[in-house]
């Protein structure tokens, strides 16, 4: 057995790449033995899989390992674009990342030229528990940070969601699925107290020493329920569509300990298609393998009424734009009218899982001197 210090941690190491090609986004839903399943699909011995994931997590190549949730079905969520005076931008970024547990991805974006919406530099994902108002939450954040304006854009439908940076490396522009992208609804699911108990233990990030085949028995103890009941509740939640995937998330923004970067460019693509054809367009755009996210969101007049948004990453800007051109050409070839399109490039960026527990929200409001009841819809 190799020691922790000489276990390779580079995402480009052949065995690590084999593991990551599966572990980033191929373990869908809840499985009883996620590391065994990664081993089965990757063809790498389970002990080696766990040793490598532990080493990459300790070394910072992997920034977190966790069971994700389909939070769009559990909480009120949106992509929010914020307009700030330039001198307040970095301070607002720090606040959203460090002091708002309900903001997830926080990124400063820019466009190659002055375009509609290019003055909205700060983009965040925000989620609040069911029953609370995302507009009120954002208005409160705007007050705390001195924002001039903000635009809340909830996802109406989801067409693609799966990161897989290693799997996408070297992908040719135009690579797409034969079939249309599946449409995921964002209807809300209500949970019992027991289900929240299980879900809270289920979704917590793994420490390196928790990377083991009996992962869920420890989480069942944490939730205060017998293992079999924990597994049954988790599988029921999975059937109800509220469990996402078991995933290793790479550090894809900052340079790694090895000096490499997983990706350099993060692009948010916008398209405006005719009202009434959003699902048709989303199912076409969502076919493209390069996209890590694709949604129907309403950009409103601030963004020239764009309604399809997608995210792609890459190590070269020209290659990211080549992928965008391939999507544009495909939309033109099928006769899908696009009245406007744009690219917002990501700069400074931080990501953390958003808190979605109603109990945590009530505590946060109280800590800020706000009556939680006043934040309800």
List each language-model region with its residue ranges:
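A compositional/biophysical signature of low hydrophobicity enriched in polar/charged and small residues
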Residues: 1-377
């Amino acid at each position: 057995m190799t020691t922790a210090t000489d276990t390779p941690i580079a995402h480009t190491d052949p065995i690590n790449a084999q593991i990551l090609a599966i572990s980033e986004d191929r373990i869908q839903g809840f499985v009883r033995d996620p590391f065994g399943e990664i081993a089965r699909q990757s063809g790498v011995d389970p002990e080696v899989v766990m040793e490598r994931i532990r080493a990459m997590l300790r070394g910072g190549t992997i920034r977190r390992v966790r069971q994700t949730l389909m939070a769009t079905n559990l909480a009120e969520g949106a992509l929010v674009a914020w307009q700030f005076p330039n001198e307040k931008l970095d301070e607002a970024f720090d606040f959203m990342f460090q002091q708002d547990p309900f903001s997830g991805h926080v990124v400063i974006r820019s466009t190659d030229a002055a375009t509609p919406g290019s003055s909205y530099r700060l983009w965040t994902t925000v989620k609040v528990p069911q029953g609370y108002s995302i507009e009120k939450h954002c208005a409160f954040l705007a007050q705390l940070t001195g924002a001039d304006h903000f635009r809340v854009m909830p996802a109406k439908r989801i067409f693609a969601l799966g990161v897989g940076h290693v799997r996408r490396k070297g992908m040719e522009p135009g690579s797409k699925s034969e079939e249309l992208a599946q449409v995921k609804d964002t209807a809300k699911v209500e949970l019992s107290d027991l289900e929240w108990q299980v879900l809270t233990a289920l979704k917590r990030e793994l420490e390196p020493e928790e990377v083991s085949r009996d992962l869920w028995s420890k989480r069942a103890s944490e939730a205060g329920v017998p293992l079999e009941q924990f597994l049954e509740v988790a599988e029921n939640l999975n059937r109800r569509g509220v469990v996402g995937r078991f995933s290793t998330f790479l550090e894809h923004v900052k340079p790694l300990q090895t000096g490499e970067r997983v990706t350099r460019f993060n692009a948010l693509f916008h398209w405006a298609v005719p009202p009434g054809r959003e699902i048709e367009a989303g199912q076409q755009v969502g076919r493209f393998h390069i996209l890590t996210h694709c949604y129907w969101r309403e950009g409103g007049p601030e963004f020239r009424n764009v309604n399809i948004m997608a995210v792609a990453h890459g190590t070269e800007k020209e290659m990211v734009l080549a992928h965008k051109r391939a999507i544009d050409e495909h939309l033109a070839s099928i006769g899908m009218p696009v009245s406007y399109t744009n690219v917002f490039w990501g700069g400074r960026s931080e990501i953390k899982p958003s808190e979605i527990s109603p109990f945590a929200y009530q505590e946060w409001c109280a800590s800020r001197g706000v009556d939680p009841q006043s934040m309800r819809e």
